Amino acid sequence: ALVAFAWSLAVVPTSLPAKAYYEILFWGGGHALQFTWTLLMLVAWLALAQACGGRIPLSPRIVLLLFLVALIGVFGTPLAYLMHEVSTVEHRDMHTWGMRFGGGLAIAPLALAVLLAMAARRVGPALADTQRPLRSALLASMLLFVAGGVIGLAIQGNNVKIPAHYHGCIVGVTLALMG
């Protein structure tokens, strides 16, 4: 992310209006940070589910493979800079596509595995008092992150869906890490 920020700073035309300048300046690095925070959130989801007594129905190898798929978006960041000028729509779309592809392919199966682990957990003994806040953080995180993701899939053009998508996702990440 720091390399992306520095690269943008070096090549963004300073003649752009301030709004466009700063949006372009932080677009690539911001998306690289989003990949990182999303991966940390997924780790937190797995940890929270296990702390609540859930057994994740995926092998460690499959989880690792899903994390590697999610990293595709991060590795695509330098390609966006090498292939397109930073002020082009193609540059911007490449970062967005990376998040949808890399993040989306990993998030869905991991989220489903966590939900299955939590559903199976409901059959066993009741949660201890110390586990209830963990479960609440996990489920609220998943709900908000998925809502933000669904809103993100509906984005077309500049409208209120963009901040709704971003805030849903970032609050989902925050709740997972607070849990």
Give the predicted meaning of each segment.
Residues 27-39, 93-109, 167-174:
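Alpha-helical transmembrane segments of polytopic membrane proteins
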Residues 7-24, 39-65, 79-95, 112-139, ...:
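Juxtamembrane membrane-water interface segments of multi-pass membrane proteins
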Residues 1-4, 64-80, 107-111, 146:
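Selective recognition of specific alpha-helical transmembrane segments in multi-pass small-molecule
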Residues 28, 61-68, 100, 104, ...:
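Alpha-helical transmembrane segments of integral membrane proteins
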Residues 1-4, 10-13, 31:
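Hydrophobic, small-residue-rich alpha-helical packing segments that form membrane-like cores
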Residues 1, 36-37, 137-148, 172, ...:
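Small-residue hotspots
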